[in-house]
Amino acid sequence: MKTRLFSCLLTLALLLAAAPAVQAANMAYTDVPADHWAYADIANVTEAGLFQGVDATTFGVGQTMTRAQFVTALVRLFDWETVIPEMPTFSDCSDPNRWYYSAVETAYANGALPSYATSFRPLDPITREEMATMMVRALGYTSLAGRMSASQLPFNDVTTNQGYIAVAYDLGLVNGYASGQFKPDQAATREQAAAVLGRLYDKYSASSRQVSRAGYTLLTVPSPEATADTSIPTTPLEPFNDLYDALKAQRTAGTDMSQVAVVFTSGGIATTVQGSRIVSTETISQEEVEEYLDDADTHVFYSEAAQCAYLTSEGTGGRTVTVWYQNQEALEAKLLLCRLFGVNAYILQE
């Protein structure tokens, strides 16, 4: 039992961090000289297969990036399976023969586009605000953006989608200007979009690696204490929002993120409740978690907010046991967040 869960967690990093299957392309654009500020970015996204030139020899430097072009590159980056719905989602993107139709529908199906929108405006230039919003949505961080909507931004011109821009900025995907502005409504050029998506691609496709403690700045994120004033004791391992805040604090403090290792718990925290009283709270091993999971009467759940699995089990004498534990989905989500902050090292401990 222990071997099954332990092996799953140990091999996870090798599986989740694999780069999307993209085909390398030739970097032979006549409009991108080697001394161009975006040369490396354009080479990166071209070789990764995210971008194509406007023709065989021209990248299109200085041309605006359309919303359709950006969402197509985003779909390639995440390597999502193509989605073709029975009925089109957007009134202005309803022709299945359009080159961007499947990419728009695929992005929508994967949460990169808001569910309330009725039109997409595929041929409109994409703005800096829209790029940030689409990337954060694509990462599945809509709830996180909502939490960050009141964050203090270093920009004096952001009035809408503050949370999305805050997350994109915290993750190092977007920057502002020396004037203190973000210029959210400014249309992005193809090379600017290449730089932004290249940053996301590099972080998303990086590898997480399990390390020893020596030589690293260790980052631990404690679980909240169990209380009796909630429907169930809530003690998630490395709660997602707390992990985000801890990583952000390290980066803000100027820490070399490449030398940070996040410590994750491989077992779980079990809290026993009788009536409205907490009887006990203890850390348990992977083997003990597996024993609960093998019990047919155990109920299994997953908290999207905390990015942590939990189970409930009825004990003797009217007692209920709640266990928050590390599973593959939880560790995958947290390792990705770490990589987005530039942290690739982690420690998995009992």
Predicted segments — roles?
Residues L5-T11, L15-Y39, E47, Q52-Y101, ...:
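Feature responds to low-complexity, polar/acidic, surface-exposed segments characteristic
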Residues S223-T227, Q326-R339:
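Short, acidic/polar
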Residues T46, Y108-A109, Y169, R251, ...:
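Alpha-helix C-terminal capping/helix-coil junction sites
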Residues A214-Y292:
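Substrate-binding surface in catalytic domains of secreted glycosidases
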Residues S258-Q259, V263-K334:
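Glycan-binding loop/region signatures in secreted carbohydrate-active enzymes
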Residues M1-K2:
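N-terminal secretory signal peptides that target proteins for export/translocation
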Residues K334-E350:
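Acidic/aromatic/glycine-rich contiguous surface patches that form carbohydrate-binding/processing clefts
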